[in-house]
Regions:
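Flexible glycine-/small-residue-enriched beta->alpha junction loops
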Residues: 110-169
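Active-site pocket-lining segment
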Residues: 166-168, 201-204, 283-352
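Condensing-enzyme catalytic core mediating Claisen C-C bond formation in acyl metabolism
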Residues: 1-24, 36, 145, 150-152, ...
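Conserved beta-ketoacyl condensing-enzyme motif
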Residues: 23-111, 115-135, 205-221, 293, ...
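Active-site-proximal alpha-helical scaffold in enzymes
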Residues: 86-117, 171-200, 262-269, 334, ...
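N-terminal extracellular/periplasmic Venus flytrap/periplasmic-binding protein-like
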Residues: 11-12, 22-27, 31-32, 40, ...
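Conserved catalytic cysteine-centered active-site region
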Residues: 55-111, 142-147, 157-162, 229-255, ...
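Short, well-ordered amphipathic alpha-helical segments that serve as non-catalytic structural scaffolds
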Residues: 26-42, 66-70, 95-98, 163-170, ...
Length: 405
């Protein structure tokens, strides 16, 4: 059987909403990632079979197949095809899994895959009139997050709960307290700050050159969202963000963010031929559907399905990255799967680092891969790692990798 390996994985810093990366177009962010991956591996770009990039919005500068735009902007040959994948929050991971399966099936030898999102630059949109020129008011939607142009039939059958309400639904169903959510959020920030200070992200984060108002340019090379000054007391004083007596707040939720991330995948045979040392083997992936109103539980059936496919158990997994859309959602997944919290998001998660939708799936896998590599010198190095995300409208996706080298 063909072996799929990951040779390199990188990401930009994750920018805050309206922060330093807000000045950079998403297609330029993605182009930087692709260009850097090729340069770091020193491969002939004509060897690349195809490029897959995830993106959740696609309503603004990321429209009309951003993967293709980024490929050309990266200076890569126009002969390389590219396609944009949309599974909302899991788009970046889906892109990687599609590429891995293509290699496994013998469709190609080398792929670039990942994801990008600029929530800061997401536009407002409103519908065209159905009959002639409109009079009166129009409803405009902020495309950075949530439903837009919801189908009335969809709403009547499944509801169109905002993402925060879906987290409230899980908090109620799994009896997750406000205190537990705030403690989890605090720990996410503290772990992320500790990882930044220790330089754990240095090998995965590439700097982004950002133009300034004075005409100069600066390099942005660090995640913007982690808060050094946060405390459980401060988090506990925040008001519920979605319902009056709720427990989900802005402090125990992920942010709206900007960023890009991608990996270089190839067959094991091609890696040997090019004298490239893989950092991990792609073991497998799985997706699953859940009720949209509890979309955050999606990683549970996706992970269970994947463990069955790979003949593994949660006891075999040494490190886990769960996208922290909300503390309530992540705690529900941990509880339902019976996971050891000590191996989950060891360097913080999206509550601290940020959640740049289409980028996040690739981002959590990139962080997982580099942490597994860093721990290779430990007395008991990790073997298997799991990356998983919940997905709006009720899905989950999971991927397992095996450390190499």
């Amino acid at each position: 059987m063909r072996e799929v390996v990951i040779v390199d994985a990188i990401r930009t810093p994750i920018g805050a909403l309206g922060g330093s990366l807000a000045k950079v177009r998403p297609d330029d962010l993605a182009a930087l990632i692709l260009k850097t991956l090729v340069e770091r591996a020193q491969i002939d770009p004509f060897l690349i079979e195809e490029i897959y990039l995830g993106c959740a919005n696609q309503a603004g500068e990321d429209n009309r197949n951003i993967a293709r735009m980024a490929t050309l902007l990266a200076g890569l040959p126009h002969e390389i095809p590219a396609v944009t994948i949309n599974r909302l929050c899991a788009s970046g991971l889906s892109a990687i899994n599609f590429a891995a399966r293509a290699i496994l099936n013998g469709d190609g030898e080398i792929y670039l895959a990942g994801g990008v999102e600029s929530m800061s630059r997401a536009p407002y949109v409103f519908p065209k009139a159905e009959n002639g020129f409109p009079f009166g008011n129009l409803t405009a939607y902020d495309t950075s997050l949530g439903w837009r142009f919801p189908n009335p039939i969809m709403e009547s059958k499944y509801g169109v709960d905002p993402m925060g309400i879906t987290a409230e639904n899980l908090a109620k169903q799994y009896q997750i307290s406000r205190e537990a959510q705030d403690i989890f959020a605090y720990q996410s920030h503290m772990k992320a700050i500790a990882a930044i200070d220790a330089g754990f992200f240095q090998n995965e984060v590439i700097p982004v050159l950002v133009p300034q108002r004075n005409g100069q340019e600066i390099f942005v090379n660090q995640d913007e969202r982690p808060r050094r000054d946060t405390t459980i007391e401060k988090l506990s004083k925040l008001k519920p963000a979605f319902i009056k007596d709720g427990s989900v707040t802005g402090g125990n939720s992920s942010g709206l963010n900007d960023g890009a991330s991608a990996v270089l995948l190839m067959s094991g045979t091609k890696a040997k031929e090019l004298h490239l040392i893989p950092i991990a083997r792609w073991v497998g992936s799985a997706t699953a559907g859940v009720p949209p109103r509890i979309m955050g539980i999606g990683p549970v059936p996706a992970t269970k399905k994947l463990l069955t496919k790979t003949d593994l158990s949660t006891q075999d997994i040494d490190l886990i990255e769960i996208n922290e859309a909300f503390a309530a959602q992540t705690l529900a997944v941990i509880k339902e799967l019976g996971l050891n919290e000590e191996i989950v998001n060891v360097n913080g998660g999206a509550i601290a680092l940020g959640h740049a939708l289409g980028c996040s799936g690739a981002r959590i896998l990139t962080t997982l891969l580099h942490e597994m590599k860093r721990r290779s010198a430990f007395s008991t190095p990790p073997r298997y790692g799991l990356a998983t995300l919940c997905v709006g409208v009720g899905q989950g996706e999971a991927t397992i990798v095996e450390r190499m080298g």
